[in-house]
UniProtKB/Swiss-Prot annotation:
GO terms for molecular function: ATP binding; homoserine kinase activity. This is Homoserine kinase. ATP binds at residues 91-101. Catalyzes the ATP-dependent phosphorylation of L-homoserine to L-homoserine phosphate. It comes from Escherichia coli O81 (strain ED1a). Pathway: Amino-acid biosynthesis; L-threonine biosynthesis; L-threonine from L-aspartate: step 4/5.
Length: 310
């Protein structure tokens, strides 16, 4: 039996639309991510468990974990009969890389079960392909950090899909999921087809400056440059209370904030534990909309997806 855990991730990080993402893990030790178990069997089966299992498609072939198994078998050129279990702990359409968690855990578990026949680069390429089936286009800003850990910059040149960017140990990521769903496809459809030249220049300056600040170890500058001119101005209308929440967390002391992925989760970066706690308390009282919502104080998950049992 192989059991793999894949952590939540926050894509875009305001400054890097479709090219930046960070894996996150709660400071209290909770597992914020999906778990997939693979066992040898006579025929294929898939069992869904976990807090959000009831939100998964009722037709097994529509389940992304089934599609991962099917695509992995196709890659190897043979059928591999296994019993798979998906522990769906991540809300769907949350902006926390929910589908990436399932895809990464499923493909990594299959690869481990088969003796690591695929290398990490090929496996990551498959992860991007499968994630693209849900979001509508291939992009790696959730699957890469989820699989490899840390903060990842998408490269997609010279056979390199992504590379790690150094993060800051003092940064605490407060993630508030309000309990409503925003589909990635819907959040993409709302974006303009073309952008003004000054917005393109600002975006390039912010992203280049952010990467420079990370490598030159300037956390204050890095946080200051986490601005979004590409997606947030258009997507915030999909998120009730988002603008007020951003203003409130800034007043409390967050050094940066924005939409996690395509939303509705809000992320707020803090550089002090007491500030993070006050931000989390405010968001818990004011940004959550129902019982399915939650707030976690997180750090970067530098390990990425990992085998829990083998």
């Amino acid at each position: 039996m192989v059991k793999v855990y894949a952590p939540a991730s926050s894509a875009n990080m305001s400054v890097g639309f479709d090219v930046l993402g960070a894996a996150v893990t709660p400071v209290d030790g909770a597992l914020l991510g999906d778990v997939v178990t693979v066992e040898a069997a006579e025929t294929f089966s898939l069992n869904n468990l976990g807090r959000f299992a009831d939100k998964l498609p009722s037709e097994p072939r529509e389940n992304i974990v089934y599609q991962c198994w099917e695509r992995f078998c196709q890659e190897l050129g043979k059928q591999i009969p296994v019993a798979m279990t998906l522990e769906k702990n991540m809300p769907i359409g949350s902006g926390l890389g929910s589908s990436a968690c399932s895809v990464v855990a499923a493909l990594m578990a299959m690869n481990e079960h088969c003796g690591k026949l695929l290398n990490d680069t090929r496996l990551l390429a498959l992860m991007g392909e499968l994630e693209g089936r849900i979001s509508g286009s291939i992009h790696y800003d959730n699957v890469a950090p989820c699989f490899l850990g840390g903060m990842q910059l998408m490269i997609e040149e010279n056979d390199i899909i992504s590379q790690q960017v150094p993060g800051f140990d003092e940064w605490l990521w407060v993630l508030a999921y309000p309990g409503i769903k925003v589909s990635t496809a819907e959040a993409r459809a709302i974006l303009p087809a073309q952008y003004r030249r000054q917005d393109c220049i600002a975006h390039g300056r912010h992203l280049a400056g952010f990467i420079h600040a990370c490598y030159s170890r300037q956390p204050e500058l890095a946080a200051k440059l986490m601005k979004d001119v590409i997606a947030e101005p258009y997507r915030e209308r999909l998120l009730p209370g988002f603008r007020q929440a951003r203003q409130a967390v800034a007043e409390i002391g967050a050094v940066a904030s924005g939409i996690s992925g395509s939303g509705p989760t809000l992320f707020a970066l803090c550089d002090k534990p007491d500030t993070a706690q006050r931000v989390a308390d405010w968001l818990g009282k004011n940004y959550l909309q129902n019982q399915e919502g939650f707030v976690h104080i997180c750090r970067l998950d530098t390990a990425g997806a990992r085998v829990l049992e083998n």
